[in-house]
């Protein structure tokens, strides 16, 4: 049995047809983590007994013929920025060392209700404020393809564990690239949803007007399955969009419609753009054309101000969000 290269959708199909049990799936990944993660440092908290207990509950429901969602029994790794009642939430910081949340974040509660066992919490830059997963109190996370290179950040642990086959799915957060960049560095798929599509309740804030929770996986189909679980309106998040989950996975099976892709001239012609990155973008655009897409060049002259604007907004909001910790006594002082 080799599951480390399987997609979440493949594992789901094997679970539904009872070729394998949820407990066997979780045990497989726990054993693989025990062998390989010491050299990667993708996980910072693991509770094998909890993971197996969650998997056993799914197996019991399936044995009784209870209705289950498509990801029931498919394990997932969680960035250590989301509040969980049964594992520490440390944000990669000594300040929060040993902190146990009294409540689950909304995304966590949705995954729990969907029957998804969690394999553990993954490494990140401290408070998600970085792009290399090197500023964590737990040490740096290594890139599975070359341990001398960075996994990216701040969701580097989530990207690395999927790339290394330690988990079929992972949850990250993205403020200024923290899902997309490590996914690219580690060769997996990552998705930052539109702001408000996924609840931020129970996510330790970095920059509140930019933060979003999103999935990381081997395939786009897996991302869609995960989005069907974690997205949707949440009254506990004032920025949550008041609309139902659109059915991401169902849309993948629909006949493709024509679509337009805008290529920002100022970005593709930027002197600072690495030639290899430019070549990869051009190659991707060719694939999109083959899929029926209309590629159109557009001009956004203000794009030169994007990064400076980010470095005004994000640090200001981060300063405000971190100030709420002042006077609290969780970890080291």
Residue ranges, per PLM feature:
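Enzymes and membrane/adaptor proteins characterized by extended Gly/Ser/Thr/Asp/Glu-rich
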Residues: 70-110
């Amino acid at each position: 049995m080799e599951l480390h290269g399987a997609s979440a959708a493949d594992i789901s199909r094997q679970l539904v047809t009872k070729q394998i049990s949820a407990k066997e799936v979780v045990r497989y990944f726990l054993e693989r983590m025990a062998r390989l993660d010491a050299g990667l440092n993708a996980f910072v908290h693991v509770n094998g007994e909890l993971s197996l207990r969650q998997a056993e509950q799914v197996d019991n429901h399936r044995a009784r013929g209870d209705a289950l969602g498509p990801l029931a029994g498919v394990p997932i790794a969680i960035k250590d920025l989301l509040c969980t009642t049964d594992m520490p939430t440390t944000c990669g910081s000594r300040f929060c060392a040993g902190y146990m949340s009294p409540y689950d974040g909304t995304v966590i509660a949705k995954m729990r209700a969907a029957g998804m066992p969690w394999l553990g919490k993954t490494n990140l830059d401290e408070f998600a404020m970085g792009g290399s997963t090197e500023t964590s109190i737990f040490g740096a996370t290594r890139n599975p393809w070359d341990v001398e290179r960075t996994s990216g950040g701040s969701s580097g642990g989530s990207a690395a564990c999927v790339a290394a086959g330690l988990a079929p799915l992972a949850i990250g957060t993205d403020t200024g690239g923290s899902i997309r960049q490590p996914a690219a560095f580690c060769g997996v798929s990552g998705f930052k949803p539109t702001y408000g599509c996924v609840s931020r309740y129970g996510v330790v804030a970095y920059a509140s007007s930019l933060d979003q929770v999103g999935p990381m996986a081997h395939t786009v189909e897996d991302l869609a399955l995960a989005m069907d679980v974690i997205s949707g309106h949440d009254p506990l998040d004032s920025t949550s969009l008041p609309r139902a989950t659109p059915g991401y996975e169902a849309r993948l099976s629909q006949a493709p419609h024509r679509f337009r892709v805008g290529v920002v001239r100022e970005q593709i012609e930027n002197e600072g753009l690495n030639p290899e990155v430019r070549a990869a973008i051009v190659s991707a655009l060719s694939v999109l054309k083959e899929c029926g897409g209309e590629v159109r060049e557009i001009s956004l002259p203000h794009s030169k101000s994007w990064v400076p604007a980010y470095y005004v907004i994000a640090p200001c909001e981060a300063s405000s969000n971190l100030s709420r910790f002042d006077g609290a006594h969780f970890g080291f002082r």
